[in-house]
Amino acid sequence: MATETYKADGFDDAIVGIDMTTMPFRLIYERSKMIAILMEQDDMTEEDAIDFLAYNTWYDHGDGYPRFVELMDKEQAFEELDHFYEALGGTGDID
């Protein structure tokens, strides 16, 4: 079991919380803030920033590595779930 919590270097301003359901705990980053950071610091377009982060950062490296979330209100969350399940051919019923 890993005993370290890792961070995404250069993205401290995008930290929005801690996942305390795993050991070790994981930092939680807001994806849209990470995109904005790259756009400002590296003069990237939004599309380039998303591509870079998707390829280099937004996947699970294992225990202790960060989680990446998109913050939204409940209506947006339910709508996103509906779209996701619809794309998979399901009904998207949420209990």
Language-model regions: role of each:
Residues 1-94:
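C-terminal alpha-helical interaction appendages
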